[in-house]
Protein backbone atom coordinates (compact mmCIF):
# COMPACT_ATOMS: atom_id res chain seq x y z
CA UNK A 1 0.00 0.00 0.00
CA UNK A 2 1.31 3.44 -0.91
CA UNK A 3 2.17 5.84 1.86
CA UNK A 4 0.69 9.32 1.85
CA UNK A 5 2.21 12.19 3.81
CA UNK A 6 0.64 15.43 5.06
CA UNK A 7 2.30 18.57 6.36
CA UNK A 8 0.31 21.33 8.03
CA UNK A 9 2.01 24.64 8.80
CA UNK A 10 0.12 26.89 11.21
CA UNK A 11 1.66 30.31 10.76
CA UNK A 12 0.94 33.81 11.97
CA UNK A 13 -0.93 34.74 8.80
CA UNK A 14 -1.79 31.54 6.98
CA UNK A 15 -2.34 27.84 7.55
CA UNK A 16 -0.94 25.62 4.81
CA UNK A 17 -1.62 22.00 3.91
CA UNK A 18 0.49 19.83 1.65
CA UNK A 19 -0.36 16.20 0.92
CA UNK A 20 2.03 14.12 -1.18
CA UNK A 21 2.38 10.49 -2.14
CA UNK A 22 5.53 8.48 -1.51
CA UNK A 23 7.01 9.54 -4.85
CA UNK A 24 6.66 13.19 -3.82
CA UNK A 25 3.76 13.90 -6.18
CA UNK A 26 1.52 16.63 -4.80
CA UNK A 27 -1.99 15.35 -4.17
CA UNK A 28 -3.31 18.44 -2.42
CA UNK A 29 -1.96 21.91 -1.66
CA UNK A 30 -4.16 24.42 0.15
CA UNK A 31 -3.37 27.78 1.72
CA UNK A 32 -5.89 29.63 3.88
CA UNK A 33 -5.50 33.09 5.36
CA UNK A 34 -6.30 32.44 9.03
CA UNK A 35 -4.45 35.40 10.61
CA UNK A 36 -3.75 33.53 13.85
CA UNK A 37 -1.29 36.21 14.91
CA UNK A 38 -3.71 39.13 14.41
CA UNK A 39 -3.37 41.66 17.27
CA UNK A 40 -0.90 39.48 19.17
CA UNK A 41 1.53 42.39 19.46
CA UNK A 42 -1.11 44.37 21.38
CA UNK A 43 -2.51 41.63 23.60
CA UNK A 44 0.19 38.97 23.83
CA UNK A 45 -2.45 36.34 23.14
CA UNK A 46 -4.17 34.60 20.26
CA UNK A 47 -7.63 36.13 19.90
CA UNK A 48 -10.74 33.97 20.16
CA UNK A 49 -11.66 34.92 16.60
CA UNK A 50 -8.24 34.01 15.24
CA UNK A 51 -8.29 30.69 17.09
CA UNK A 52 -11.74 29.92 15.68
CA UNK A 53 -10.67 30.76 12.11
CA UNK A 54 -7.67 28.49 12.44
CA UNK A 55 -9.62 25.64 14.03
CA UNK A 56 -12.20 25.87 11.22
CA UNK A 57 -9.36 25.60 8.73
CA UNK A 58 -7.90 22.59 10.54
CA UNK A 59 -11.32 20.89 10.37
CA UNK A 60 -11.38 21.48 6.61
CA UNK A 61 -7.87 20.07 6.29
CA UNK A 62 -8.78 17.02 8.38
CA UNK A 63 -11.44 16.13 5.79
CA UNK A 64 -8.76 16.21 3.08
CA UNK A 65 -6.31 14.21 5.20
CA UNK A 66 -8.93 11.48 5.63
CA UNK A 67 -9.98 11.59 1.97
CA UNK A 68 -6.38 10.92 0.90
CA UNK A 69 -5.85 8.20 3.54
CA UNK A 70 -2.80 9.97 4.95
CA UNK A 71 -0.50 7.54 6.73
CA UNK A 72 1.99 10.06 8.18
CA UNK A 73 1.47 13.66 9.17
CA UNK A 74 3.35 16.51 10.77
CA UNK A 75 1.64 19.62 12.04
CA UNK A 76 3.85 22.51 13.06
CA UNK A 77 3.11 25.89 14.58
CA UNK A 78 5.39 28.88 14.16
CA UNK A 79 5.93 32.47 15.30
CA UNK A 80 2.52 33.44 16.72
CA UNK A 81 2.39 30.31 18.86
CA UNK A 82 5.94 30.84 20.09
CA UNK A 83 5.02 34.15 21.69
CA UNK A 84 1.33 33.85 22.62
CA UNK A 85 0.49 33.31 26.27
CA UNK A 86 -2.48 31.08 25.40
CA UNK A 87 -0.83 28.69 22.93
CA UNK A 88 -1.56 25.65 25.10
CA UNK A 89 -5.30 26.43 24.96
CA UNK A 90 -5.13 26.58 21.16
CA UNK A 91 -3.09 23.36 20.97
CA UNK A 92 -5.63 21.54 23.16
CA UNK A 93 -8.44 22.48 20.79
CA UNK A 94 -6.37 21.65 17.70
CA UNK A 95 -5.60 18.19 19.11
CA UNK A 96 -9.34 17.49 19.42
CA UNK A 97 -9.62 17.86 15.64
CA UNK A 98 -6.74 15.69 14.46
CA UNK A 99 -5.79 13.61 17.47
CA UNK A 100 -2.28 15.06 17.45
CA UNK A 101 -1.01 18.24 19.06
CA UNK A 102 0.81 20.71 16.80
CA UNK A 103 4.56 20.78 17.25
CA UNK A 104 5.92 24.19 18.25
CA UNK A 105 9.06 24.70 16.19
CA UNK A 106 11.86 27.21 16.66
CA UNK A 107 12.50 30.10 14.32
CA UNK A 108 15.65 28.33 13.16
CA UNK A 109 13.74 25.14 12.30
CA UNK A 110 11.02 27.20 10.63
CA UNK A 111 13.63 28.85 8.42
CA UNK A 112 15.22 25.52 7.50
CA UNK A 113 11.88 23.93 6.65
CA UNK A 114 10.89 26.85 4.43
CA UNK A 115 13.54 25.69 1.96
CA UNK A 116 12.35 22.06 1.84
At which residue positions do the language-model features occur?
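Nucleotide/phosphate-binding catalytic cleft detector across ATP-hydrolyzing
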Residues: 1-10, 18-116
Amino acid sequence: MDQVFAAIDIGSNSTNLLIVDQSGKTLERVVRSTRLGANIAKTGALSAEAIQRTLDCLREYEVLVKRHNVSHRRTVATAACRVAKNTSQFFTEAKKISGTEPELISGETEGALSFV
